[in-house]
Amino acid sequence: MKIGVIGAGRIGGNAARLFAAAGHDVLLSFSRDPDRLAEQAAGLGARASSGRPRDAAQFGDVVMLSVPWSAIPDALGQAGPLDGKIVIDTTNQFAPGGVQPLPGGVTAAQYNQQRMPGARLVKSFNTLTSGFQASQAGRTPPETRVVLFLCGDDEKAKQVVAGLIEDAGFAPADLGGLADAGPMEAPRRPGSVYGEEYRPADARAAAEALRAGRYSSP
């Protein structure tokens, strides 16, 4: 599969490394230093390349958006239309001084879907730090793998992203639609799964409890 990565920093860069190692083709983009980005891509092997956000958007069967919250408008402007694309949204709504408040009581995932209305958005790869993801990918046996939660309104898109989560060495756990994404979004707080480490069995129980409205974080 071809994966365009917009934002090849800690989360996006690590995901690109894991995807390339699993046999996917990746294109890294959105850097102030194109030469350094090219070096980063070269370090991932023959399946990786670099370019502009528009290149990543056109290249990818899947596009990963992994930029700071304040950089999203610029990144999307450079990417151009994402209509029909599966977009993995790894962003968290951090702003200077804390978490960015959102209008209308929507989740951050819903807000980003409004910013790219034609995209098939799936929220994932955002609940655990980049260092933790890098060090814990690929645990064996499978039942000990670390969980990455996902939310989205497009079931087929979620299936694709769940497969990529598995390819990256994690276990996927579906929390529902974009309106259900709140518990997996920043900040870390009681009643959320953001910042918490789960195994598959515990994640299934947490997902069921969230749907039933009776979940409290460990």
Where are the regions that the model predicts?
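Active-site-lining helix/loop region of Rossmann-like oxidoreductase modules
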Residues: 143-218
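Rossmann-fold NAD(P)-binding glycine/threonine-rich loop
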Residues: 91-139
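Short, conserved loop/helix-junction motifs that constitute active-site signature segments
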Residues: 78-84, 116, 140-142
